[in-house]
Amino acid sequence: MAVQDVYRALSDPARRKILKLLQDGPLPAGAIAAEFSISWPSISRHLGVLTNAGLVRHERNGQQVIYQLSTSVLLDIVTELAELTRVGGHNADHPNQERKK
């Protein structure tokens, strides 16, 4: 996983919507496409970007391709971002955090 690929994948609202759709469980590509008013090639491109970033995985089931959320990459990114907020053992600039004097 390249971090920049994950951020690029997450930067698009349509791809974030796909991830939200997959929160409830695996879906066939057709069911994902039915939630959008954009072309099938555009949906396919979005699914490819998400797959290449490691955010979703897919498997073929007969004629269907089933997509599933892959949370491990998301957890890695969230952990990395959370670490960036820590300065001197506490959350920097957190409004509820008392500052040391």
Regions found by a protein language model. Give the residues of each.
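Alpha-helical residues within the helix-turn-helix
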Residues: 34, 45, 51-52
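Amphipathic alpha-helical dimerization/coiled-coil segments
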Residues: 1-2, 8, 70-101
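N-terminal helix-turn-helix DNA-binding core of bacterial DNA-binding proteins
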Residues: 2-41, 61-73
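A short linear hydrophobic-aromatic micro-motif
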Residues: 18, 53-56
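Core alpha-helical elements of the protein kinase catalytic domain
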Residues: 20, 47-48
